[in-house]
Design a protein with these regions (language model features):
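Conserved short histidine dyad/triad with adjacent acidic residue
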Residues: 46-64, 100
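Short acidic-glycine-tyrosine-enriched beta hairpin
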Residues: 83-101
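A generic structural motif
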Residues: 79-81, 117
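A short hydrophobic beta-strand segment most commonly corresponding to one strand
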Residues: 97, 104-105, 109-118
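Short, surface-exposed beta-strand-loop junctions and turns on beta-sheet-rich folds
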Residues: 68, 84-86, 113
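Conserved catalytic-core motifs of eukaryotic protein kinase domains, centered on the activation segment
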Residues: 81-83, 109
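A short, N-terminal "cap"/entry segment at the start of jelly-roll beta-barrel domains
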Residues: 1-51
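Short, conserved beta-strand element in jelly-roll/cupin
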Residues: 63-78
């Protein structure tokens, strides 16, 4: 899908519907199952990137970007490996702040879709 021209005010995009094609995750990051991820970049606004990201059921580690995200659908547990922080459960409506370089383990119970600002 093409990027949404965010500089054009008044444009609407549906972040829940189009299907996002998933790519399998590399074996060295997968901890359980066969999760895949898909992304749709929506563009940039004032030097900030916006997009929709999705992960299917399973568990995988990630090194995070500096971002804020809002969960649109699904459910997951996020374990913080570094820095060591308490685990969180996220679901539809959750708003989370991550910082660049955080190491996390995502255990997705129900395919998770989020809008991110990074």
């Amino acid at each position: 899908m093409s990027a949404l021209p965010l500089e054009a005010a008044g444009i609407v995009t549906d972040a829940l519907s189009p299907a996002l094609p998933h790519e399998p995750l590399p074996a060295d990051v997968v901890h359980d199952g066969t999760p895949g991820t898909g992304i749709r970049e929506l563009g940039a606004f004032r030097d900030v990137e916006l997009g929709v990201w999705e992960m299917s059921e399973g568990a995988a580690v990630d090194t995070e970007a500096d971002e804020v995200f809002i969960v649109l659908a699904g459910a997951a547990r996020v374990d913080f490996i570094a820095p060591a922080l308490p685990s969180i459960e996220v679901r539809t409506g959750s708003v989370v702040r991550l910082t660049e370089g955080m190491r996390t383990l995502w255990t997705v119970h129900e395919t998770l879709r989020k809008v991110y600002v990074a």
